[in-house]
């Protein structure tokens, strides 16, 4: 063992040993309890960032710990390799997306290996490889045959200049990112998977996931958005047309003063035929793409159609308006508006001078000022004919009953969740395995013709997908007759919805999954990834698992038992303002800092001497140029130090502030561990530990060791508070550094302690522990060493400290035997000099004893 800790000399050597010996290869073994630990797979963007490092370090700590406690651990890694960024990079670098992607994968794989993660690389999955997406295509054709896939028109962003579809992120302030042409909304046919068929189960099964964060479950519940209400049909005056609306508040039905419909509603189109102003308003509204999140805050705009709807219960006519806050793909594309009791309807009514009819009164009978706001709470009905005085529940049922009896309404459960649109008009994705025959019949690509391979040697022009631009690519035959292949590709969420299952059998070629392998390893025991995936990936991932179950491939209901959402990584951000008033962000690695006595930044300058503005700690990002390159940090400090800092600086689910001073502190701590093992290894124990022969000080030190083992085991295994586990090891190290090594039992206690420290640190800092384990004289590698177990008998204290109070004030502390009786404790306390002087010449009127904790005397003169 070298005297000095030098990570760059150790880490590559240890990593080579792991690779050559396939130490982390996972093999099904029904005699052992399995443990499947998975971090969300990365997009191969070119370089790892600190967010990746944090996610994967957490996963690796969990995996190594579970392996040490005797479980059969699977920890795989792969690449979510399709996606839009590759197309942009290919155009920019004049290369093909595939070439760019594969080069990035190789580079990033090297970075992952450099960090020492214990992956089974034989299970690596790359989602853009035909052997992977072949089975995704096959499964899609199976879903189509089951009636779970359909095609319908849907709105997309269309650039008329480039004649191409744009992804949302390619639309900048309503214009095309490439040519600045105003973007239009266009209806085109797209493929959908019926996730709505599973809405109820996706919702109710959230209750079966006690080890998922409540925040994620709440976000999914809201996204699925189950509501109970009534669908009501209004007739249109002077025509046979009908207008269905859905409401969750039938109690407000008598307050309807207008009906609002979406710009794309058939009635709106009909009304616009002879109304050029309305036609123009509709065109403008259709071309303003609105994210649902913006609906509440955006300016409400509308126009009267000239049509009137007949209220089914009062017979009164109410105007029909086109409004920009109603979306065609939500519910029926129409809403009954009750301005008195809905904030959005109220804003719109105030703007356009529409009637506001109060029909709900606060339960306490108080007056409400309708000039200021709508009253949106439940209450008591007024101005509602025979339904007056009913509360919400009574009115809901009574009005629903009446509408149903009149055949103009029906109770209905609705979901906010929409079917999953999986068509993308991009090139770099898996081709959708459908084709159209010359007589217009839409059919699936037969199994023997799968995969439909995406050509990889293409030239990107930055405008159109190469498979759309090449008329030859789509040409095929079906039953000997000409047909055309679909040129759209899958949404990349398709690949990431089932990769976790493919890891269980990546070399299996007889089908999508080997059910024996998949059902042995699944569900995932621990899944780790960011909370930003709560309503997209994590919902599709659950949905796909249920589809695979219903296809008879899997036998579990949910894909992952436990979910941990790691916090973001933040770093200081600095900028100066250019002469053109633009913020120029300077990397923290280029900044010279001055701090005050409390460590706060008081001055920051760049290499040119410019004074910079410190904008605080923000998420590491390219836009603020405050990302820290993990590779630079590993080269400077070592992988173990980076890993230790990542796990220690903050609880796993909270944000982590990157501080290089903290990284330096982590390196110093590992240096102290190294030095202590080195010092011990120069003069190791020759006698075995003899518990009976230990001195009081030796017993105390040994007690601290075993208490730390118990705490660290609980913190890593059950609580997942990795930072407190590390803090406990650091505290123990402080005691060990001060412990004497004067006799054989000193050394024997130290040998046991160091063996424990090295094993407890191993999941977090595996390279240094690999070396230290050998230095402690162990023949086998630490990779196969069992986790250290606390000795209960060592934690039993021989002595207890009892606090002694006289008339409520602490007057002394006495040490007593852990087996002392109450009378013995009282005698020792009364004999203590500090206590005795307060008991002299007084009468003890009461004694209260809390065993081995406190003794209290009440006295009077």
UniProtKB/Swiss-Prot annotation:
Residues reported in the UniProt entry to bind ATP: 622
Q: One GO molecular function term?
A: leucine-tRNA ligase activity
GO biological process terms, semicolon-separated: leucyl-tRNA aminoacylation
Q: Where in the cell is it found?
A: Cytoplasm
* Catalytic activity as recorded in UniProt: tRNA(Leu) + L-leucine + ATP = L-leucyl-tRNA(Leu) + AMP + diphosphate
Q: Name one GO cellular component term.
A: cytosol
Provide the top EC class. ligase
Q: What EC number is given for this enzyme?
A: 6.1.1.4
Q: Where is motif 'HIGH' region found?
A: 42-52
Gene3D superfamilies (UniProt xref): 2.20.28.290, 3.10.20.590, HUPs, Isoleucyl-tRNA Synthetase, Domain 1
Sorted alphabetically, the keyword list is: Aminoacyl-tRNA synthetase, ATP-binding, Cytoplasm, Ligase, Nucleotide-binding, Protein biosynthesis
- In chain numbering, motif 'KMSKS' region lies across 619-623
Q: What CDD domains does UniProt report for this protein, alphabetically?
A: Anticodon_Ia_Leu_BEm, LeuRS_core
The organism's place on the tree of life at top rank: Bacteria
**Where is it chiefly localized?**
cytoplasm
Spell out the Pfam families in the cross-references.
Anticodon_1 (PF08264), tRNA-synt_1 (PF00133), tRNA-synt_1_2 (PF13603), tRNA-synt_1g (PF09334)
Alphabetical list of InterPro entries matching this protein: aa-tRNA-synth_I_CS, aa-tRNA-synth_Ia, Leu-tRNA-ligase, Leu_tRNA-synth_edit, M/V/L/I-tRNA-synth_anticd-bd, Methionyl/Leucyl_tRNA_Synth, Rossmann-like_a/b/a_fold, tRNAsynth_Ia_anticodon-bd
Q: Could you say which protein family the record assigns here?
A: Belongs to the class-I aminoacyl-tRNA synthetase family.
Protein's name in the database: Leucine--tRNA ligase
Q: Which organism is it from?
A: Actinobacillus pleuropneumoniae serotype 5b (strain L20)
